[in-house]
């Protein structure tokens, strides 16, 4: 089956792909302020391998509680992909239930906790969102989310706003609270034994490639893929390149 067939879903690729690969469930976790919309550009390619679910990560305010609830609702064994905050949650899932994760993809994320400076900045964002300024905070984050060539992309900016509305101000506050208190996941890297993809972008102004390389170096056998001319949101910015990397990960 060709990559084009898998990516397009043409010619019965979804059903056939699931049969060929014993229908591995795929669990996707969005980032801060992200909703299932973030994975829409690449989800069809993954349906060729099994059922695809996007986790609900807005209901709890600690990484431990978020991971426990996701695990309670997840299949017994699955391929796990986490984007940004979703990567922080993925690390917590690896600590709680490593044997349930068949494959791991860490997308534009990091293993380090927030520095005091970043935590202080997030505290300001938290206060503004609580005061009703969710879209104001998202507009402030947007330039760091995307490649400079997309700063004036009204469609992409609308996606960020729409996802924020999906999450709601209350959900965003819970997410930020969990992020600010998350543990250092660098000690977890050496414990990961499943096939792992570390996917990053060459122009991610939110989380640098140095952080991606640190994760790839720390996980035995991990593969590092860097998407060119792309910011922090590779799924909508570079959907084909992102889908190709994820399909190769699932085929590994």
State what each model feature region is.
Residues 213-232:
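Catalytic histidine neighborhood in serine/cysteine hydrolases
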Residues 203-207:
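Acidic catalytic loop of the alpha/beta-hydrolase fold
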Residues 20-69:
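Conserved HGGG/HGGXW glycine-rich cap/lid loop of the alpha/beta-hydrolase fold
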Residues 114-117, 132-191:
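Conserved alpha/beta-hydrolase catalytic His-Asp/Glu region
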Residues 63, 95-96, 100-139:
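Flexible "cap/lid" loop of the alpha/beta hydrolase fold
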Residues 192, 198-200:
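Short beta-strand/loop motif that positions the catalytic acidic residue
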Residues 230-243:
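Catalytic histidine-centered segment of alpha/beta-hydrolase-like enzymes
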Residues 82-86, 90:
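Gly/Ala-rich beta-loop-alpha elbow adjacent to hydrolase catalytic centers
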């Amino acid at each position: 089956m060709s990559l084009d067939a898998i990516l397009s879903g043409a010619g019965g690729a979804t059903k056939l792909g699931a049969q060929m690969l014993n229908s591995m469930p795929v669990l996707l976790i969005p980032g801060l302020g992200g909703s299932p919309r973030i994975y829409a550009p690449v989800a069809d390619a993954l349906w060729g391998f099994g059922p695809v679910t996007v986790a609900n990560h807005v209901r709890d305010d600690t990484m431990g509680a978020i991971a426990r609830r996701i695990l309670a609702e997840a299949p017994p064994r699955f391929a796990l992909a986490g984007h940004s905050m979703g990567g922080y949650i993925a690390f917590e899932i690896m600590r709680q239930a490593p044997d349930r994760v068949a494959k791991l993809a860490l997308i534009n994320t990091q293993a380090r906790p927030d520095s005091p400076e970043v935590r202080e900045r997030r505290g300001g964002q938290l206060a503004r969102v609580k005061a009703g300024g969710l879209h104001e905070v998202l507009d402030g984050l947007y330039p760091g989310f995307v490649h400079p060539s997309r700063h004036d992309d009204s469609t992409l900016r609308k996606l960020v706003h729409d996802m924020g509305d999906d999450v709601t101000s209350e959900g965003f506050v819970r997410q930020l609270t969990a992020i600010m208190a998350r543990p250092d996941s660098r000690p977890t890297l050496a414990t990961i034994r499943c096939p792992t993809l570390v996917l990053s972008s060459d122009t991610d102004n939110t989380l640098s490639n140095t952080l991606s390389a640190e994760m790839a170096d720390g996980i035995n056998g991990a593969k590092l893929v860097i998407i060119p001319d792309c910011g922090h949101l590779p799924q909508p910015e570079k959907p084909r390149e992102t889908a190709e990397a994820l399909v190769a990960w699932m085929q590994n």
